[in-house]
Design a protein with these regions (language model features):
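Alpha-helix initiation and N-capping motif
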Residues: 81, 115, 127-131, 152-155, ...
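Acidic-enriched, low-complexity/disordered segments with a strong bias for Aspartate over Glutamate
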Residues: 41, 49, 59, 117, ...
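Mobile "lid/hinge" segments at catalytic clefts and subdomain interfaces of large enzymes
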Residues: 57-60, 64-147
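Non-catalytic terminal/interface segments that mediate subunit docking, oligomerization
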Residues: 1-28, 163-227
């Protein structure tokens, strides 16, 4: 994140390509891949990044930094101080009023161009959708226009999962959904009809740690109803 030490940003963790390929191979070897949705994030920027992640086994993708930059983030790494100079990562009304210039249309434009880029790569590969390419690591080709030292790297393990016979390469089984808590179900039953009818709803309830996801079910129902 923007508040991480620079040493952590540069050196901590592993490239998502390596861990994604490893997770894909392990799940397929154990016959569990069809039960799991694999999501990857961290440095995804272009349609080609999405295609590569798909070929390595990703079902979905997370974007954080680039949409924030589309809203005006300058990556000043002071998010935790509540003094963001662009008004993006602050709750200070004065800073937001004076400096925040972000528009949702900019984020929409970014993802629109991203999707168009993905579509061009899909057409070049002769695929109709990303689902056709999930786990198709055999389609990855190593570049030859790289320095000699990089040519010495053995990247064959990145493609190992594609050669496993008979194992599912992406999620096929429906997700396992935990039943909502009684309070969450009560909120859904009481608030959803009112919100669907265009009326505002106000409720005061006592919650504890068992209701950490309170409101998620209602948000999902609204998303299904209104998109």
């Amino acid at each position: 994140t923007g508040v991480s030490p620079i040493s952590s940003i540069r050196y901590a963790g592993s490239p998502w390509e390596l861990r994604l390929a490893e997770a894909q191979e392990t799940l397929r070897r154990n016959g569990l891949r069809e039960r799991v949705r694999l999501q990857t994030d961290g440095g995804l920027k272009t349609g080609l990044d999405v295609i590569k992640a798909t070929l390595l086994g990703a079902d979905s993708f997370g974007f954080g930094t680039v949409p924030m930059m589309a809203l005006g983030c300058k990556y000043l790494r002071i998010c935790h101080l509540n003094t963001c100079a662009t008004g993006v990562a602050t709750q200070e009304p004065r800073l937001r009023a004076q400096h925040f210039k972000g528009l949702p249309e900019r984020v929409i434009a970014y993802f629109t161009y991203l999707v168009e880029d993905v579509r061009r790569h899909l057409a070049a590969l002769g695929a109709r959708s990303l689902e056709d390419l999930i786990g198709r690591a055999d389609l990855l080709v190593e570049r030859e226009d790289v320095p000699h030292r990089q040519q010495l790297l053995d990247l064959s393990r990145l493609k190992a999962s594609a050669s496993l016979p008979g194992a599912a390469s992406h999620r096929a089984a429906p997700p396992i959904a935990a039943p909502p808590s009684p309070l969450a179900q009560q909120l859904l039953d009481e608030a959803f009809p009112e919100l669907k009818a265009g009326r505002s709803v106000r409720r005061e309830v006592r919650i504890d740690t068992q209701d950490r996801s309170l409101g998620a079910g209602l948000a999902g129902a609204l998303a299904k109803a209104f998109g």
